[in-house]
Amino acid sequence: MESQRTFLFIGLMLVSFLLFQEWNTDYNTPKADPSATTQTLNPTSSESEDYVPTSSDSALPASATLAKRSVIEITTDVFKVKIDTRGGDIVETYLLQYEETKGSETPYMLLGEFDGKQYFSQSGLIGLNGPDASAQGRPTYHVEQKSYTLTGDELRVPLQFTDSNGVNFTKTYVFKKGQYDVALEYTINNTTSTPLQVQLYTQVKRTVQDKGSMVDQNYLGAAYGTDDDPYEKYSFSDMADKNLNKITLGGYVAFIQHYFVSAWVPMQDQSNTLYSLITKSNAAIIGVKDEAVNIQAGSEQTLTATYYMGPKESDVLEAIHPDLDLTVDYGWLWFISQPLFVLLKWLHSILGNWGVAIIAITIIVKSLMYPLTKAQYTSMAKMRALQPKMAALKEKFGDDRQKFGQATMEMYKKEKVNPMGGCFPILLQMPIFLALFYVFLESTELRHAEFIFWLTDLSAKDPYYVLPILFGASMFITQKLQPMTVTDPMQQKMMTFMPVIFSVFFLWFPSGLVLYWLVSNLISIVQMLIIYRGMEKKGIKVRG
């Protein structure tokens, strides 16, 4: 019985430590050492602000220094976007339906320049005749107007460039109402008398980030998917160690952070090259090079790709690419987390409050696990009832551990008690707890979600630490109700401080997660009282 309590304590501590460690590992990535990365650059790559990948078929001259930006502004119902006419890159994106901070009127800035750091989405045409491979540097596009506003279901923003040979290039961004994915269309009109060869590249560039504080949920890093590996993280340190270079059918690349993702999805019916590097200016880049294409004289061809910049919503991401929803990282228990999130979302659609939905899903989960809970507490109570007999056996056999062990097992067999009966149900419940942890941590829907009174953001810690304190109190009550007696002084101290330790752990956890644990504990207390009352009616002594 003492071993069961010790096992429970160690198990909970281990799970909490692993969760806390995983949280910090995923959301706090150490800064890569620029000196360790500069040697991996291709010698033909640019040392200017722009990095243009080397074509599969030709070396690229260095591009010119980036000129002062001339931008156009695009406003939709979900975006405010700025596009640099030089290169046609997306250099700033505000998500209009998401606040920067709770209660502020400032929309969330996903892409842009902030705090001396950059986060851009870039694309262009390289190859033998690609304008981005020109010795004069990246092309400066002509635009018909400086601002565009979505008024219907679709908005097309064309950027046009004509090279010295008279070849017309039209780079068009297509925005749609209510959507965070943007279509990219490159139309090449070969007006010359000779064939052209071009190659589309798409990439995301972000300044390497410093490690945040232990409890700060910061930028994670890059990720990619191939036909063999649907989702693989590629952190700043991974980039510093080795440049990514994978050829795949289809695929995607992305930068992921807490709640949001930006990702390029190339054409899926062709072979693409995924690449990465960290530049001397400490910018991390991950991108895709499409296959080189030949455009015959007098003909026209359009190359396409899709760029997503927005919240990590599984169903939306899956519609763009079947594996892109994996950037909503539910950990190795994703197969449990995903249906739990679907259930949570359904409950919210009925109840209208995410806090109430968390309480409801807790009740459902605890009800489904009640048979395991009953088996756990029943086993503990039976072990408690055998304590006098255990003490008698210990006195009878003294230091003869072999005979004491044999006699103990015979007693268990006679009394039909499994000494591990209280531990096995705990092990079965742990995956549920872990899965729910990732649901509460990863779900964009919980960002800035209100519950009651002071709990105005279930994705953030409790500002007044009320929930962690109540959790500690509920854990203390649970200890007092459990029918176990610990005689070892060290174990007594461990049990005494366990509620305090867990309360401290939960001080910085998302309040939605702490709410789940608190409600779970309260339900466990009620279930425990019901189970023990039934056992006492049967004449089984539960508490001493």
From Swiss-Prot:
Residue ranges crossing the lipid bilayer per the database entry: 341-361, 421-441, 499-519
Main location (coarse class): membrane
Biased composition (Polar residues): 35-46
InterPro entries on file: Membr_insert_YidC, Membr_insert_YidC_N, YidC/ALB3/OXA1/COX18, YidC/Oxa/ALB_C, YidC_ALB_C, YidC_periplasmic_sf
Record-level Gene Ontology MF annotations: membrane insertase activity
Annotated coiled-coil segments of the chain: none
Signal sequence coordinates: none
UniProt-annotated location(s): Cell inner membrane
Keyword terms: Cell inner membrane, Cell membrane, Chaperone, Membrane, Protein transport, Transmembrane, Transmembrane helix, Transport
Region listing for Disordered, in residue ranges: 29-58
GO biological process: protein insertion into membrane; protein transport
Membrane topology: Multi-pass membrane protein
GO CC term, one of those recorded: plasma membrane
Source species, domain of life: Bacteria
CDD domains the record matches: 5TM_YidC_Alb3, EcYidC-like_peri
Family: Belongs to the OXA1/ALB3/YidC family. Type 1 subfamily.
Function, in words: Required for the insertion and/or proper folding and/or complex formation of integral membrane proteins into the membrane. Involved in integration of membrane proteins that insert both dependently and independently of the Sec translocase complex, as well as at least some lipoproteins. Aids folding of multispanning membrane proteins.
Protein name: Membrane protein insertase YidC
Organism (species): Pseudoalteromonas translucida (strain TAC 125)
The organism's taxonomic lineage, starting at the top: Bacteria, Pseudomonadati, Pseudomonadota, Gammaproteobacteria, Alteromonadales
Gene name, Swiss-Prot/TrEMBL: yidC
